[in-house]
Amino acid sequence: MWPQPHLPTHPHLPTHPHLPTHPMMSKETRQSKLAEAKEQLTDHHPQTNPSVGTAASDTKKKKINNGTNPETTTSGGCHSPEDEQKASHQHQEALRRELEAQVHTIRILTCQKTELQMALYYSQHAVKQLEGEARDLISRLHDSWKFAGELEQALSAVATQKKKADRYIEELTKERDALSLELYRNTITDEELKEKNAKLQEKLQLVESEKSEIQLNVKELKRKLERAKLLLPQQQLQAEADHLGKELQSVSAKLQAQVEENELWNRLNQQQEEKMWRQEEKIQEWEEKIQEQEEKIREQEEKIREQEEKMRRQEEMMWEKEEKMRRQEEMMWEKEEKMRRLEEMMWEKEEKIRELEEKMHEQEKIREQEEKRQEEEKIREQEKRQEQEAKMWRQEEKIREQEEKIREQEKKMWRQEEKIHEQEKIREEEKRQEQEEMWRQEEKIREQEEIWRQKEKMHEQEKIRKQEEKVWRQEEKMHDQEEKIREQEEKMWRQEEKIREQEEKIREQEEKIREQEEKIREQEEMMQEQEEKMGEQEEKMQEQEKMRRQEEKIREQEEKIREQKEKIREQEEKIWEQEEKIREQEEMMQEQEEKMWEQEEKMCEQEEKMQEQEEKMRRQEEKMWEQEVRLRQQEEKMQEHQEHLEAAI
């Protein structure tokens, strides 16, 4: 509720109090109210003229000319009682008119006082609003400090976790390097994959260079925005303080003008009315300026909200990056587990190979024992076949020495068998039958070898298909990565366009700020002129006690404004400190982003090494398969030799 000041009542005017006009009231409402008040006064006083000074001058002329008027004087210069009554009646009427004019002026002055009081009330209300806004700013600053502390704690925790992860990754890299050295000795790298990797690395380097340039542009734009942020709040506070001072000075100027009007009211009524109109126009201009300032404040609040939203988005981006890092770490763990499993498979295969080798040695020993027994039996049973046994011994020694030259040994066996046919013509038929059986067995062996070769070809084809499928998958992954990179580039282009728009807006704001500064300078010059006038008026105001009270109130208000300015300065200092802290936090965030980039590069290198190791493991597995096939072939050949020997015996 607005306060209702006490006004003096008039018997002819309505008794309701004059409600104050709101500072946002339009010109038409005030003009209409003033016109109604004037009409009421003229209706109740029809005898008064528009100018009171003329009526007073007429009465003086009548007083002077009373002695010279032939109608009112006698021939002897004596006044009749009727003339004296008329003169006294006229004199009373003139006095009444003067009193009514003075009452009218007093009422106008009281109305002006009420308006001035209401203006002071509104200024005090605005000061209270500013105090509330300052408190809100302080609370926001406290909240921002708390949020900054939480961010620092989170950043420290993330830094410790990253250090641990880096140490663990370094240990893993050392182990992997050792394994890679061992694998390089046993494997041969593919040239086509190297060329593809080189091309992809070149593409990645180009993309990273473009990203670094974009980041530098973004940083420069952020710095510009921070500078604009630093300039805007200071200018707002100064502008508000200047406006309050100007309002107070305008109020004091109005009061002094009213005092001067009271001293010269009887002579300058018309000038006072003109001044009232001018003052009303000035008030309306002030109201318009206040509206413009409120709109500017709203725009600045919207900008601050947008900046807060940007900060929140940046925090969300940081959270997303941390989640990506966690996912990458999980992928690294999975790859390490795969490597361990592959190593275990390799150990198992090596153990199997060792077991097979041991079995081969045992079989060789058994064969040697059997051959020795056969030789002993041959010596006991057949003394005549000593020459043949010696030849068989030679053949067995050759088989032991050269396992790979089994075919040559078979030819020698044929030659030896032919010699045996020449020596033993009696057993030709039996030997022919044995030869036919040997031919059949050899055909069977050849068929088995062909079957084994077909199986090997099938295995190789399956491996080739698997490799082709893996290559297709890798190519699909590469296509997906290229599409993602293109999407990121499009996003970066969009961000650059937005940043350019923001720069244009900032330039427009800077131009507006410069215009405001020029206006403020002009207003300060006007204020200096007004202060000089106020010095002259204060000497006159010392005579009036009422005006002194008003001056004391104004001084109290000025002290409050000074206190508010000091508080605002303190708030500005706090804001500067907070901005410095925010800058430090942003620098920390930039350093963390650089570390994240380095870690991503390391992860890419590790993934490439893992791929190379997997290829080497695949090659080793293929070699193991080939070795197993060879061992099987050797075992079959050894069995065939044993059968030949048994048949020959």
UniProtKB/Swiss-Prot annotation:
It comes from the Eukaryota. Keywords: Coiled coil. Residues 151-644 form a coiled coil. InterPro entries: GOLGA6L. Residues 25-46, 80-94 have a biased composition (Basic and acidic residues). Residues 10-23 have a biased composition (Low complexity). Residues 1-94, 300-330, 358-440, 455-572, 584-620 are annotated as: Disordered. Residues 47-57, 65-77 have a biased composition (Polar residues). Belongs to the GOLGA6 family. This is Golgin subfamily A member 6-like protein 26. It comes from Homo sapiens (Human).
